[in-house]
């Protein structure tokens, strides 16, 4: 009996499932900025994820999930390069893949196409250990199709009919279903004037130097340099990435310098905040010598929090996060910042790709700060932007993103209109 993990057909189906993500990763790697190339490729490849999901036989379901988990989320293990547990990197990739193998086995347990339709649409609600980056809906972020559940259901039905044995009989139905899922506002470009005078900083701070105290002076000088450059451009707000200032800012003399500079330009910066024995991943907004603070609400599973029962959580926190009494804590709710008449919601990395951040917010504009150096080089920045674009379109939001070790950008709620700021060398 052939080992199911080495089923070649399952691997090819997994490649079909993730093809739109990898195609966009290649475009990002070669800095291809023509949006019509991205839209054409995504519109053709994203439905293949549905076709792979539909056609995988039950005895290959586990293998499909295993390969999808490895192909989409191998980068989760790359952060171990900066720990004392580098040797665990291959094991982490395999463990992640096994989790998604089990998940897909359950999702594809029945081969009935309408069961597969419901399980595909429901898969984005299933978050193993709180990790919510498997959102197949987001594969359509840069496609000509709408990204709501109804439209995705129509596309899946079209896949059912167009892949039927009696194609001639069902071809017209399939085509009509695809037409029904089209976004007929394809050529609409959203007005981004509200955020046109904001400077998004892309930094290149290596992860192995970021928390080195000997490198702090260099980080401070680069921050001051970027602020002065933004002032010369007459920008009203400058945005730095997550933990751009990598130590607790509140008790640092550098805070006074930022307060003084905020007389002429507002400064939004990612940093850390200590309160008692709790550590918060925070964003500070300096304006007119005053400061607003928002702490991260949704912590990254296994990176900032152990999503496990307490009897496992405590020893693993001690093992991976060290003997320090300081542990990451989260804020109880999201906060919005107000800058004159401009209101926006600040988000920090992982929480920016989570549905709760968008579904309950009256804010039109979201500003996200990320440190992607943990996972560079990998497909993580592409997958992140795919998810962010999905939420921008799904909830009609404008998302600004300032990142370390990846591209900074402004995402439009319409299909067209994104503005990318390529990372500096």
Swiss-Prot record:
Membrane topology: Multi-pass membrane protein
Enzyme Commission number(s): 2.3.1.269
Superkingdom per UniProt: Bacteria
Active-site residue numbers: 242, 296, 349
Localization, UniProt: Cell inner membrane
Signal peptide segment: none
Keywords noted in UniProt: Acyltransferase, Cell inner membrane, Cell membrane, Membrane, Transferase, Transmembrane, Transmembrane helix
Coiled coil spans: none
Keyword Cell division carried by entry: no
Keyword Acyltransferase in annotation: yes
Record function comment: Catalyzes the phospholipid dependent N-acylation of the N-terminal cysteine of apolipoprotein, the last step in lipoprotein maturation.
Homology family: Belongs to the CN hydrolase family. Apolipoprotein N-acyltransferase subfamily.
Protein name: Apolipoprotein N-acyltransferase
Taxonomic lineage from the root: Bacteria, Pseudomonadati, Campylobacterota, Epsilonproteobacteria, Campylobacterales
């Amino acid at each position: 009996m052939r080992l199911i993990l080495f089923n070649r057909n399952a691997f090819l189906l997994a490649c079909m499932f993730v093809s739109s993500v990898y195609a966009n990763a290649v475009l990002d790697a070669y800095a291809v900025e023509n949006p019509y190339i991205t839209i054409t490729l995504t519109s053709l490849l994203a439905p293949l994820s549905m076709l792979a999901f539909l056609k995988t036989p039950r005895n290959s379901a586990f293998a499909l999930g295993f390969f999808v988990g490895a192909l989409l989320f191998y980068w989760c293990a790359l952060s171990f390069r900066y720990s004392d547990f580098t040797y665990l990197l291959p094991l982490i990739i395999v463990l992640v893949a096994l989790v998604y193998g089990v998940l897909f086995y359950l999702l594809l347990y029945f081969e009935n196409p309408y069961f597969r339709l419901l399980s595909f649409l429901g898969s984005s609600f299933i978050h193993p250990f709180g990790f919510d980056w498997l959102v197949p809906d987001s594969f359509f972020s840069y496609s000509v199709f709408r990204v709501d559940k109804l439209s995705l259901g129509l596309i899946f039905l079209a896949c059912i009919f167009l892949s039927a044995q009696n194609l001639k009989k069902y071809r017209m139905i399939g085509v009509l279903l695809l037409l029904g899922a089209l976004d007929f506002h394809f050529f609409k470009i959203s007005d981004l004037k509200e955020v046109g005078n904001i400077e998004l900083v892309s930094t290149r701070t290596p992860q192995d130097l970021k928390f080195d105290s000997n490198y702090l002076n260099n980080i401070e000088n680069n921050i001051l340099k970027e602020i002065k450059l933004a002032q010369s451009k007459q920008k009203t707000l400058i945005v730095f990435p997550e933990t751009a200032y990598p130590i607790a800012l509140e008790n640092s003399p550098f805070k006074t310098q930022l307060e003084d500079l905020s007389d002429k330009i507002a400064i939004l910066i990612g940093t850390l905040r200590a309160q008692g024995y709790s550590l918060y991943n925070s964003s500070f907004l300096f304006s007119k010598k005053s400061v607003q603070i928002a702490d991260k609400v949704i912590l990254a599973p296994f990176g900032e929090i152990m999503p496990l029962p307490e009897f496992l959580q405590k020893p693993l926190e001690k093992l991976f996060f060290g003997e320090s009494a300081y542990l990451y804590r989260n804020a109880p709710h999201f906060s919005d910042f107000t800058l004159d008449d401009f209101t926006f919601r600040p988000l920090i990395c992982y929480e920016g790709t989570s549905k709760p951040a968008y579904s309950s917010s009256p804010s039109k504009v979201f500003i996200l700060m990320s440190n992607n150096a943990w996972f560079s080089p990998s497909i993580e920045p592409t997958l992140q932007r795919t998810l962010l674009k999905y939420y921008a379109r799904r909830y009609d939001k404008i998302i600004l993103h300032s990142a370390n070790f990846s591209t900074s950008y402004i995402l439009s709620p319409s299909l067209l209109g994104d503005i990318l700021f390529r990372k500096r060398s």
